């Protein structure tokens, strides 16, 4: 019984990820197979596994998708809270891609809550981080 439960849990995580990956790739929280509410729930379920496996890029992309889903539902305060916690986590990890994705999430939230100047600042900061990383990689 324990083995089948473990296998089921692993299978459902893989199934969830396979459904979420196209949404992440195209940066859209819309799908006929997944509701925006499911994206939010699945992010919470998948986070520990992705952290354990050190799939940080996928984890932060999933968090960005979750923020987009919250924005789509009109939950701006939840979206900004999620984006800010995402930013704090990336900073604690010193993970520049996570920081840049967090700033994109913050910018998306500002843009959709009619504060475009704050959004632009977040986007600029994200681009600066990515540019700096690219320059260091190419040296």
Show where each model-derived region lies.
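Residue register of alpha-helical TPR repeats
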Residues: 16-18, 57, 61, 101-102, ...
């Amino acid at each position: 019984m324990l083995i089948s439960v473990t296998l089921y849990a692993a299978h459902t995580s893989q199934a969830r990820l396979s459904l979420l990956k196209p949404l992440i790739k195209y940066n859209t929280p819309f799908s006929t197979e997944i509701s925006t509410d499911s994206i939010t729930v699945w992010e919470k379920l998948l986070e520990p596994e992705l952290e354990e496996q050190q799939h940080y890029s996928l984890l932060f992309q999933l968090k960005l998708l979750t923020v987009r889903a919250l924005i789509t539902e009109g939950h701006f305060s939840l979206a900004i809270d999620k984006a800010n916690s995402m930013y704090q986590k990336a900073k604690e990890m010193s993970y520049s891609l996570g920081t840049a994705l967090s700033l994109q999430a913050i910018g998306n939230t500002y843009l959709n809550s009619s504060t475009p100047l704050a959004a632009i600042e977040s986007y600029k900061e994200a681009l600066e981080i990515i540019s700096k990383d690219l320059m260091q990689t190419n040296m």
